[in-house]
A protein has these predicted regions:
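Divalent-cation
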Residues: 1-92
Length: 92
């Protein structure tokens, strides 16, 4: 049985990049995902990205080499929540 890896990302417009807010493997990842869903936080399955970002520390900024894929992921989540591109700066 394959172990689940979960990595929670957060974007703060005052920081230069998104950062790792939480992470876990196995049972901890399952709990992290359940907690996110319970609180209405979008959950997206991107196994390769989660595996790559898992090696960052909680609080660590996403490296520049991942900017594009993470930006695409965050834009997808933002759009699926019914927001337009112009809404990003106005939310707080």
């Amino acid at each position: 049985m394959e172990r689940i890896t979960g990595v929670a990302l957060r974007y703060d417009e005052e920081l230069p990049a998104p950062f790792v807010a939480a992470k876990g493997r196995g049972e901890l990842a399952t709990k992290l995902i359940a907690l996110a869903r319970e609180h209405g936080v979008p959950v997206v399955s991107r196994e390769e990205l989660a595996e790559s970002l898992f090696y960052l520390e909680v609080g660590e900024l996403v490296p520049e080499s991942f900017y594009r894929v993470v930006a695409e992921l965050l834009a997808f989540v933002w759009r699926t929540q019914g927001h337009g591109a112009g809404d990003i700066k106005s939310r707080k």
